[in-house]
Amino acid sequence: MDNNNNNFSTPKQPTINSTTGGQLRSRSNSSPSTSSISTPRNGSTTATTSSITNSIGKGSLVFSTMENAKKTLNMDSLSTPMSQSSKKRLSMNSSLLPPSSIPLPPSQQLSAKKDPSKRHSSFISTTTTTSLGSRPSTPQPNHTTNNNNNNNNGSNGNNVTSTNISSMLESNNSEILSQNQKVTLSTSSNTAFSSLPSSTNNGNNPLSNSGGGNGNHHLVNSNSSTSTPSPTMFISTTSPPPELSLMEGFNQHNLTTTTTTTTTTTNNTLNTSNGINSNSLSPSSHLNNGSNNNNNNNHLNLNNRSSSPSPTPSSSSISGRRTPIQNFNSVGGVNITSKTQPLFSDREESIQAVCRFRPETAAEQTLGPSEKQLTIGTDQTTIHITPTSSSSSSMAQAFRFSKVYQPNTTQESFYNEVGKPLIDNIVNGYNVGIIAYGQTGAGKTFSLGFSGGEGNDSYNSYCNRSEFYNNSHYLYGSQQQQQQQQLLPSSWGIMPRIIKDLFIKQDEQQSMNTPQRIKFTTKISYLEVYKEKVYDLLSEGGVNDIEIRMADGGFIVPDAVQSSIQTFTDFLTHLQHIEKNRKIAETKKNMASSRSHAIFIVSLLKEDLENKMTVTSLLYLVDLAGSESASKIDGTTSKIEETKSINKSLYALGGVIEDMSKNSKHVRYRDSKLTQLLQQCFGGNSKTCLIVNCSSSNHESVIRETIQSLNFGQRAQSVKNKPLQNVEESHSELKAKLRELNKDIETYKKFIEKISINSGVIPPSSVATYITQLQNACEELKKKNDRLQEDIINLEEENSDLPKKFNVLNKNNVSQIEILTQELELSKQINQEQLLKIEQYSQKYQATNEEIQKSFNHRQQLVNDLHDSNEKSKQLELKLKDALLNSKSESDEIRLKLTKALEESTDKDQRINTLESNKQKWKSKCNEVVRQSKELQDRLNILQSTYSNSVDSLSNSSLNNNNNESLEEIKKLKLNISSLTNQHIEREKSLQKEIDLARSKHTEQTLILKNLKTQIDTLTNKLEIQFPTIVNNNQQQQQSTQSSSSSSIESNLIISMNTIEVLFEKICKNQEQTNTIISTNVESIMGKLVEIDENEEFIRKEKDRERERAENLKNTLEDAQSNFLKQQEEIKQFIETQLKNKNNINNNNNIKNNNNNNKLKSKKVGSSSSSSSNIGSSICINILFFLIILVILFFLMVAVGLTIQNQDYNSQYRSSYFFKTT
């Protein structure tokens, strides 16, 4: 039961330098600054008082809002009543919190430089208790606190004024004088010791002995009965605003300053079994948000934990034992004053691994000796495996964990140190994972508590007593908790105990608040991974192979059953049903070995009905199946397959750990169903604790498996999670934050208006120099302020030493009181002089505050300039986007043109190929015609040679003349035809050359276009690659400028602008280069196209001339043909008339001869003449036929040549048109 239910967090316990005891080494990532108190060598006790030290660090502080700066500067706005001395201390400490983001040197911190032992201690007062070196966290909405930083209703939000320090110092000095007068009066009446309060060892004094106390003290003294109290003028300071992170890594709430004493005392006893303190600070005080659990059984720190005392097991007396119990006991006691660090924190943290050893089994006790020995270090965090003999070749090994538990550790103590501190985190909205790992039979299921009741009892034996539990479920107090503790079997592990405490915690929170204000909803789900298939054990019969889906937050199992439970009895009934469905089999090392991975998930929903805020959290309790070599299994193939699947999933889990430790970009979660389900525990947002279960046997075969488990646990500690609080804020809270932000914006606008009225705008070029000047001026002012503060501290120390001097003088001799009174009078005069000095210092301090305010205003102006530059960068980004889009559109158009040109070029190539094929066909036909003409000419020559004599004899002179003329014309025609054919052939050759040139030019142009296309593609790719990098650089620079100081803001701004300008210039240059390349290529193409056009015009003119020539030839041929036909007809008619005349003459001669009685002679002559006439007519007919064939062939050749010429001209004209269009 909590003694303090307010919003205070338990303070840290300081470190005491002691010469005895071992030192516990903490494995936490970072340790807070704690105070140290030196003990005198002579054994005398001295009072320890020191000034407060706010660990600011070397970096600068930044106010998140203007109101926080006003709160820090205007100390009159603090609503909590306090004394003038406390106001003085607050005003002095306010100088530690400079306005705006102007960097402060480390010397600005208040520290007692003369006494190094006082630098890291805090002020001690009877008013409040604050934690050392802690930072306040965000306040919880469920608790109400008197926070000094939230009550500023009386202060003006626009006027920032400095504190009237002189009045505070005067009041403070008046209090000192009045106190000194009381001291003099008390010493004069011999009652000096009775008037001053003395600190005795009763547990109620902050400076009490370390043997007592409740864990809320700040400092611990040596063993003395009395100590000198600290002066009443030293009070604890109020914590800075929650927006100022003075220290990193502590989860504590805002501290409030009250005038009443809030220290509570509890007399705790020390349990010194094995030399380990079991009643140190409670782990929950470091882990919980504002809770302080003062149960005596839970006061063990997670980094300074010891094994709970338990009787020595009876198995130690068995003969043949190779591992004695004393090997696992600490050699020396652990120092109780060592630093206590929490196992879990709110920032990025590593997985915490603990190791638990189980006692040896009967089979392990009969094993022979080994060359290695396993021991636990005195700090209870290290495990050493050393060779027993120097001759062995094995090397010594050491493993470090957060805590190592010995075999005699009980279930209750193990849970109190590992599981119980996590309950508050679960209730407050953090995901928690507890995972048990180890070899088969190492005690994983026993540690988590998945087994049955005590001894041979089962869950039914506990369910029979559920009626008593339900009746006492809503009672509170130590008696009821003791009754519930007696109900729980001692052999039960973490799972039932943490569920029980969760319900108790829920009922406690519901009882502390108004009825029906907080509502809890608890649901459970139970999954089993068996042979890479997920089973839902809460469903009837267990659903086989449930689907795992990928969501925004990771992997989810949407089809899994979630059963709602309202009491601990409901949980037990579900668990009884679940355990029957688990896959359990017998192995060599375990009679009931878990052959599957069990994942028990508890989802908790906390609803604040008044504030309308919900908090969700998940609890993972994972019982991993034991890894075992397949060669050691004697069984069927199904058991071998089970072992292979178990080893495969554990290997995948090791791969995930390896990826996380190496910070690789891709983590192999998808290699196994187990790694998918445990994504939140390894690398997610949960607080994860890995329990490495091992055997305590020293046999070599067992130690080999133990080393494997220890290596896995040590590697798992390198994985870092980022725990986050799952809180959903209501609309009203978000609206309130929005209103505050709007108010801040309005204040900023007003400041901007004032700055614009009072001073001009600084140009961007001189911003950097102006910032450096402001920084130098601020550093000088800070140095002056440091000197003033040192003087003030020295004066305060001198004033605080006065009553001590009176006490010492009173102890030595009462007669020296008069001298002391005189000294007091002198001190009064000195104080008056000091007051004057302090007034002067206060005036200087006020001036420095005004200058700082001016610098703050200038910084606001610089911030505005930064916003303007960000807007300009955004405009540049938009311009770059437009340029990219335009270039993309132009490139797309060029691509379309290129594709069209390529398609047309391919079509033309195909046409040219078809024309060439046709041309070759025509050429072949022409060759055949020429060949046939040659054959006919040969025949004609033969005929001419054979029948030339007969023709000459038959033809008359006129016939011979006509034939000669016709033959000459025919010869001339032949010559013309041959010349025309030669010209046509030459023209074809020239045209072929021109076609080849056009093709070569076409190929060159296609290559040029392809190169242009590749260049355009590369440019677009470069633009697409460079544009997001520019945007990311701008965003990163904006983020860095927001988090850095004013100097770094301006330098980063200039650098980012220069980089943007350089990149923009590069892009413009690249664009210009591409444009020039494109323009040059286009010009060259256009020139080539002009040349092609000119060539086409020349070719067209030549073709026109050829056409005219062909037409003239056609006309001449037609005329010649018509003349030839006419001549042929005349020749035919002449020949016919001649033949008729000859026939008539011959007939007349024959008649005459017949009449003259020479019948025989006349018959011979008639036969010879008729035969000769018949032969001449046949020869003339053949010659005419041959001539007609030649003329027809000539016309055919001319027609073929004209068609080929027309086709070539059409192809060239189309190609020229294509190039013109491109």
Curated annotation (Swiss-Prot):
Disulfide bonds: none annotated. It is a single-pass membrane protein. Residues 26-55, 122-165, 194-209, 216-238, 254-325 have a biased composition (Low complexity). Residues 1-55, 75-165, 188-343, 1144-1174 are annotated as: Disordered. It is found in: Membrane; Cytoplasm, Cytoskeleton. Residues 724-1026 form a coiled coil. Keywords: ATP-binding, Coiled coil, Cytoplasm, Cytoskeleton, Membrane, Microtubule, Motor protein, Nucleotide-binding, Transmembrane, Transmembrane helix, Transport. Residues 350-719 form the Kinesin motor domain. One of its GO terms (biological process) is microtubule-based movement. Residues 1-25, 75-85, 326-343 have a biased composition (Polar residues). GO terms for molecular function: ATP binding; ATP hydrolysis activity; microtubule binding; plus-end-directed microtubule motor activity. ATP binds at residues 438-445. The chain crosses the membrane at residues 1183-1203. Microtubule-associated force-producing protein that plays a role in organelle transport. Its motor activity is directed toward the microtubule's plus end. Belongs to the TRAFAC class myosin-kinesin ATPase superfamily. Kinesin family. This is Kinesin-related protein 9. It comes from Dictyostelium discoideum (Social amoeba).
